[in-house]
Amino acid sequence: MKTILRNLFYTLKRFQTASVLNLMGLSAAFAAFVLLMMKVSYERDFDTCYPHADRLVMLNLARPQEENYVSTLPRGPIDYLIQQVPGIEYGTIYSPAWQKQAFYTDPKNPQYFYEEPWAVYPDFGKIIGLKFVEGSDQEMNRPESVIVSESYAHKLFPNGNALGSYLYTDTPEWRNPEATKFRICGIFEDLPENCQFKNDLFVPMGKLQENDWGSQNFFAFFLLKPGVSVEEVNQQIAATEANKRLFTGDQGTQKLYVLPIQKLYYDMYSPYYFKTGSRSTMTLLVSIGFLIILIACINLINFSTALAPVRMRSINTQKVLGSTNGELRRALVAESVSIVLIGWLLSLGIVAALIRLNVLSFMGFTPSLLVYWKYVLYTGVIALLTGIVAGLYPSWYMTSFPPALVLKGNYALSGKGKRLRTVLIGFQYIVSFALIVTAAFIFLQNRFMRNHELGIDKDQILVASLPQMPYHSSPYRKFDSQLKSFAEIDDIAYAKWELGATEGYTQYTFRYKGNNYGHQYIDVTTNFCRVMGMHILSGSDFLPSDSIYTSQLNFIATQDLQEESSIPAGETLDFFPWGMSATLKGYVNNVQFTSLKTGSVPYIFCPNGIYSNNVLPFAYIRVKAGSNMDSALQHIRQTMSECFTGYPTEVKFYDQIYGQLYQKETNQQKIITWFSLLAILISLVGVFGLIIFEAAHRRKEIGVRKVYGASTGQILWMFGRSYLTLSIVCSLLASPIAWYAISEWLKQFNEKIPISPWVFLITCAIISLITLITITIQNYRTARNNPINSLKSE
């Protein structure tokens, strides 16, 4: 054993570059694998942290052809079902803030910060199993109470006096308008990152929209009684009057039902607030992780096999001295295991360094060796198994020849040895090609979505996030006046939403001649369409007087609605959710304020909605064409700080806002791109290492060829030809696999790019070029050597 190890260290030292590269590739592969397994743990364990996760369900509203769509609900059926369904133990409304609200902790010196508190019922803590470190939720039946997370309490009150302290607000909370300050009555343990209720602030739900069966603004969660199944509760819901009493515009076609909380993440699509994932993505990540490990394992097998001719004499000497094949093979497998475990330990150091450098945000979660320690240990077990598997064939191979054969020739360069290496390297090329093509198409689809025509002049629009106060208040008037005095500002419009930042907005339904038409409803100022660069296709634009509150609302709709309904401009609509009528003043071109993953839904813009309370906290600032955007940004920021002193404000380019919709796809693209590049890099490391050995063992052949007149270029082509052919053949074999994977991924988008053959050809060319460059760099010196030296040494 000592002799074998001594010979191994001598060989590794002799081929130092190849040895270091192989170990680096192994370490990088396991670092990628550890990170991917952490991500898989995050995905796999989503919403499993609750004490009664198997009894926690969400109430949803099924619609025709939208069974997997998470719908907002009216409050009426939520309260009704909590009282009427015997299988429900506890129930809570789960109401989003819809807008950020400004709070402060010191009334004498207000320093404002924005938060989005969720409104819940007093039983919320029992339903999801909150653990309180201080106080409790017993006071959550009082309107001026609030519970906060432990980390948030430390952030707001570093001295530890959070319990009993107050959060103040100047703008009444819309779900609880009588509350202008909130007393912290409980501090709960932070919930894990991979759960739906990861929020820092929960307030009591007021009396807003009680007994309202039409306005859809809420979500709801129930805790079922022990032993009661989801199917039983759904039967109990169907037996009530809830579905008949719904007044959401699609009577008779909708159905209330509950679904397990864990189904929300994996099987539902939610445009609002809730996190969603997919099992196919998790499968893809697992596959990528194991493929990278397999590539590294193949490198190790090739590396060990290539070392065989150098080590064969020592191994056969051990046979002569009495060592059995079994003993030698166990020792060689132990070597392989040791190398892999060293690589695994180095990979943990790499992961720790990457976490410390904070460069893993694209992973979509917070990696941690401590939090995911179980999965880190699992990767260690896999490393052990990898070492055993990678060592089995080389150990058998190096001990399988009689001494006479060892003295006669070089099996490593025989036909059978070459075929083995060709198959192993070919597999690496197939995996690398498929991953790179997949990453390329994901990049192209993301670029297509980001550059898609939105129907507005996005390049001339800046969006400012302002405090929640009426837009005709004194600070807003000052802000508006000062900005318009700047020569580069064309005009300013205001809206309730940061359009383009979310997958959906307030949805309502109106009735016209007995038919119901759904739409996304946006509160705006009368100049909004002009500022955004929309074009009036029929009818007329808003007049300034259209913003006056009357019993008649004023609408402008997008062309989608006209194509769907054929309602002429100027008609009166029955806006029954509010018990009002509305005048459809005109139509504008279609606009895209959601991602291309969602279907097209008409938009309606209204300047005199009764529920906006004139609070339109997003300013859409149109900059004149050709203006200096940096100068405009500087002026806007300065004006915001002067007009809204103490309030946190923000201004963005519209592209920044719209890009948030594709953050998940962007992260996915980065994951696949980086790990695809790693896969091809590890493959090239393997090729590089084999070229070193092949060049070393073919020095005599090279010398003879040089003596007979072969040029340096011919020698390089002799090495590169087989690898070039292999890369092209493997690219052809991998193309159907990559095409299938991409076509399946693209199915989630309503508008998508074509699968162009040029991407496959360019990827093949890039891989072939990189391979040739690698071969040329490594073999150039060998090809240039004096043949006399090569023949003399041989």
Label each region the model flagged:
Residues 118-133, 146-277, 481-661:
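Mid-to-C-terminal secondary-structure elements
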Residues 31, 35, 257, 336-403, ...:
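Small-residue-rich transmembrane alpha-helices
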Residues 12, 22, 43, 59, ...:
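Generic structural signal for small/hydrophobic residues in well-ordered secondary structure
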Residues 5-21, 25, 296-339, 400-411, ...:
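Intracellular coupling helices
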Residues 1-5, 10, 14-18, 50, ...:
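Membrane-helix entry/capping segments
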Residues 14-42, 277-313, 340-341, 420-445, ...:
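Hydrophobic alpha-helical transmembrane segments of multi-pass inner-membrane transport and secretion
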Residues 21, 28-55, 358-363, 431-459, ...:
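Alpha-helical transmembrane segments
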Residues 36-101, 209-210, 215-222, 234-235, ...:
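Membrane-proximal extracellular/periplasmic loop immediately following the first transmembrane helix
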